[in-house]
């Protein structure tokens, strides 16, 4: 398997409860390296651009409002099969359906406030990483 990078966001519900360290521990326990990380407060424009794929969905406005409601931690994760591995460690979007030991089972408050985002494909990972990180900010 090839080394791959994926993009992660620790969402406002995670930063508000000061559980970013616990989430990072689960990420690292899964064998992923955090090769870039910064805490930011997304602007409305950043959130709308990031979630543009959901623009026509009824929850879009609520999602954008949530993502700008407090700080987030944006990250680049690296490892073998990183995209699938991170999606496994995140768990199902609905925390009640997430497997034991996953981030969402342990920490998500609801389907909407589910603590983390992870890229779903190599193409989206590249786009999402480029939205928040310059190449020299990623240090493997």
From Swiss-Prot:
Record's catalysed reaction(s): a 2'-deoxyribonucleoside 5'-diphosphate + ATP = a 2'-deoxyribonucleoside 5'-triphosphate + ADP; a ribonucleoside 5'-diphosphate + ATP = a ribonucleoside 5'-triphosphate + ADP
GO molecular-function terms, A-Z: ATP binding; metal ion binding; nucleoside diphosphate kinase activity
Localization, UniProt: Cytoplasm
UniProt entry tagged with the keyword Nucleotide-binding: yes
Residues forming the catalytic site: 117 (pros-phosphohistidine intermediate)
Main localization of the protein described in the UniProt heading: cytoplasm
GO biological process entries: CTP biosynthetic process; GTP biosynthetic process; UTP biosynthetic process
Record key words, sorted: ATP-binding, Cytoplasm, Kinase, Magnesium, Metal-binding, Nucleotide metabolism, Nucleotide-binding, Phosphoprotein, Transferase
EC identifiers of the protein: 2.7.4.6
Source taxon at top rank: Bacteria
Record InterPro entries: NDK-like_dom, NDK-like_dom_sf, Nucleoside_diP_kinase, Nucleoside_diP_kinase_AS
Binding-site list for ATP: 11, 59, 87, 93, 104, 114
Cofactor: Mg(2+)
EC primary class: transferase
GO cellular component: cytoplasm
SUPFAM superfamilies noted in UniProt: Nucleoside diphosphate kinase, NDK (SSF54919)
Keyword Magnesium listed: yes
Subunit architecture: Homotetramer.
Function: Major role in the synthesis of nucleoside triphosphates other than ATP. The ATP gamma phosphate is transferred to the NDP beta phosphate via a ping-pong mechanism, using a phosphorylated active-site intermediate.
UniProt-listed NCBIfam families: PRK00668.1 (NF001908)
Family: Belongs to the NDK family.
Record's protein name: Nucleoside diphosphate kinase
Annotated organism of origin: Rhodopseudomonas palustris (strain BisB5)
Gene this protein is translated from: ndk
């Amino acid at each position: 398997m090839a080394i791959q990078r994926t993009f992660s966001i620790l969402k406002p519900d995670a930063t508000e409860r000061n559980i970013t360290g616990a989430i990072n521990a689960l990420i690292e326990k899964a064998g992923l390296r955090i090769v870039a990380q910064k805490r930011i407060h997304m602007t409305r424009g950043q959130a709308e651009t990031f979630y543009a794929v959901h623009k026509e969905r009824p929850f879009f406005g609520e999602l954008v409002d949530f993502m700008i409601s407090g700080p987030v931690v944006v990250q680049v994760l690296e490892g073998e099969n990183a995209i699938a591995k991170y999606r496994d460690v995140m768990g199902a979007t609905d925390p009640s359906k997430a497997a034991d030991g996953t981030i969402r089972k342990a920490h998500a408050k609801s389907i909407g406030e589910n603590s983390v985002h992870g890229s779903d494909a190599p193409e989206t990972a590249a786009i999402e990483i480029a939205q928040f990180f310059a190449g020299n900010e990623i240090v493997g």
